[in-house]
Amino acid sequence: MLYIEKERKLPVNDKYDIIVVGSGPSGMGAALSAGMMGAKVLLIESQGSVGGISTSGLMSHFTGHVRSNLYQEVLRRAALHNTFKRGLKTVTIDPEMLRITYYECLKLANVDLRLYTMVCDTIVENNKVKGVICESKSGREAFFAKVVIDCSGDGDVAYKAGAEYYMGREEDGKMQPATLMFKVGGVDYERAIFPPSFETAVQVPEGEIQALGKENLPFPAGHVLLYGSTLPGIVTVNMTNVIGIDGTNADDLTGYGHCSGVDIIGIEDEVHE
């Protein structure tokens, strides 16, 4: 069954040099860089806070070799705790402090921010994205820009503009399991074990820790991956796996949240043991 939505005129909220869609680490980098260079920038975020996975996702740390001046400035302002692992400088994340720091940086860069605002369509002229159409509590409205940068995480802007895409691996279209990070309090750091990767074999009195995980954790969880945090006694856990999830399907995402919550209970009990 199809329903034909009636045609209507939309208010044009504003025109910008650059619109960035999505306020995760990539979106923050794009918006802050453009703003600091003097561009008129709008950052659009569908959730109620900036930072994406790095904040709302309760991520444990930044990894890799990114060492830009902007990155270093964000870290300096957040006053994050620095550690060293496997020869690489790894920065532990305090999600709340990072969130506050992002807001401060956006203000300093004169970036306009719209939270709770979802991009539901694109404005395309002559095969070029000229703006976006958004839905929010303010209603449906249009924003125009010279450049639109897609940092949505799922390529939402590119998809809505008609770009070609594929999902999952080539042979069967399956995607990696969905993961929900969580934190556990009251941990004795002197006794806790922190395997640095999924593959790291660590011997404990009961046996090899990854083998124990595969044997005892609720399927499809099976690896043991724990990280220290910036707060005493708090450990970040990266061990939930929910398979068969399409990240572009609202029903799948709804079910994933419930399944991850059930997994967390079993994982916490097993890790405690």
Task: Spell out what each predicted region is.
Residues 159-273:
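Rossmann-like dinucleotide-binding core of oxidoreductases
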Residues 14-16, 138-147:
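Core beta-strand elements of the Rossmann-like FAD/NAD(P) dinucleotide-binding domain
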Residues 123-142:
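Conserved beta-strand-loop-beta-strand element in the redox core of flavoprotein oxidoreductases
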Residues 5-7, 15, 33-40, 45-128, ...:
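Conserved N-terminal/central alpha/beta ligand/cofactor-binding core
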Residues 136, 152, 161:
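Glycine-rich, N-terminal phosphate-binding loop of Rossmann-like dinucleotide-binding domains
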Residues 21, 143-157:
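Short hydrophobic core segments
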Residues 10-24:
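Beta1/beta-strand and adjacent pyrophosphate-binding region of the FAD-binding site
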Residues 27:
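N-terminal Rossmann-fold NAD(P) dinucleotide-binding loop
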